[in-house]
Amino acid sequence: MSVMVVRKKVTRKWEKLPGRNTFCCDGRVMMARQKGIFYLTLFLILGTCTLFFAFECRYLAVQQSPAIPVFAAMLFLFSMATLLRASFSDPGVIPRALPDEAAFIEMEIEATNGAVPQGQRPPPRIKNSQINNQIVKLKYCYTCKIFRPPRASHCSICDNCVERFDHHCPWVGNCVGKRNYRYFYLFILSLSLLTIYVFAFNIVYVALKSLKIGFLETLKETPGTVLEVLICFFTLWSVVGLTGFHTFLVALNQTTNEDIKGSWTGKNRVQNPYSHGNIVKNCCEVLCGPLPPSVLDRRGILPLEESGSRPPSTQETSSSLLPQSPAPTEHLNSNEMPDDSSTPEEMPPPEPPEPPQEAAEAEK
């Protein structure tokens, strides 16, 4: 007996999330829509390292030390792992307010500010919060309909509010925020070391080959090495400079967004309330602190829309999927067997009982 199982398509929350992000692997991977520069990053790293492992490492492992390709492989794998983690993870997107929540916030704002006369500009929607004896302003996001937490900002590219927003990095194809900043920093740090490492041993390789066949002949025989040197030379300055800048920000417990806006170094000279005044403590908090869980329920299941027909319950569904076996019947006489074609409403009424024998004789 064959049983047909009807499966309904489950709608995940990531399919209905607002914003300009793209999702893969059933919501497990989250990126920005503009991924062209991210693919360029992958191509440059993979292409340069492939040439280095294919040509220079084989020669240097024999002539110098077999540890050279081993250390290069470790740097390469660590750089790729941190890049993919920073690119594919949730940077700390804050969910938008539901319609009921947005209406409640609007009522609170109207009750606080009062009715604004027509033609006049409404006052700025700001709340004050105290952090380490410093007043921090919480701004209202007109897109997400929420008061943003401290250090959060709205990314115009991804169209989402991100907690502890640092910047939007096209090289990793994602925003850099509270949940992936440490991986971004480790990526640019390891990439700087890898670039210096490949560049230095390319120079060593050219020098060793030049001692045997000459400098010009070496350049003619190794065009891949020349290409690697050019890529590493022009990449080195930007990557190392970016790493130094973010090392400075980590030491101060500051974000790129705050540094650009001059939040703690402007005219007011307001002290940074998030800094511990100690470089070691700031580095430990930013890079080694507990990683907060994602508040964006990407893989949650949306509830079924209410319709006229009630969906079957779990017990009804499970019982309907099981093969039904006929109930055992007792041996009945032909006189006692009921008619299958008749329903309880169609069964004939019972015959009236016969009068007692004594009553019949009295009537006679």
Swiss-Prot record:
Keywords, in A-Z order: Acyltransferase, Endoplasmic reticulum, Golgi apparatus, Lipoprotein, Membrane, Palmitate, Transferase, Transmembrane, Transmembrane helix
Quaternary structure, from the entry: Interacts with GOLGA7.
Active-site residue list: 169
Record membrane topology: Multi-pass membrane protein
Gene from which the chain derives: ZDHHC9
Descriptive protein name: Palmitoyltransferase ZDHHC9
Domain notes per entry: The DHHC domain is required for palmitoyltransferase activity.
Pro residues composition bias: residue spans: 346-356
PROSITE patterns: DHHC
Membrane spanning stretches: 36-56, 64-84, 184-204, 229-249
Catalytic activity, as annotated: L-cysteinyl-[protein] + hexadecanoyl-CoA = S-hexadecanoyl-L-cysteinyl-[protein] + CoA
Compartment(s) of residence: Endoplasmic reticulum membrane; Golgi apparatus membrane
UniProt region (Disordered), positions on chain: 303-364
GO molecular function ontology, one term from the record: protein-cysteine S-palmitoyltransferase activity
Main location as per UniProt: endoplasmic reticulum
Cytoplasmic side: 1-35, 85-183, 250-364
Function: Palmitoyltransferase that catalyzes the addition of palmitate onto various protein substrates, such as ADRB2, GSDMD, HRAS, NRAS and CGAS. The ZDHHC9-GOLGA7 complex is a palmitoyltransferase specific for HRAS and NRAS. May have a palmitoyltransferase activity toward the beta-2 adrenergic receptor/ADRB2 and therefore regulate G protein-coupled receptor signaling. Acts as a regulator of innate immunity by catalyzing palmitoylation of CGAS, thereby promoting CGAS homodimerization and cyclic GMP-AMP synthase activity.
Keyword Acyltransferase: yes
Bias (Polar residues): 310-323
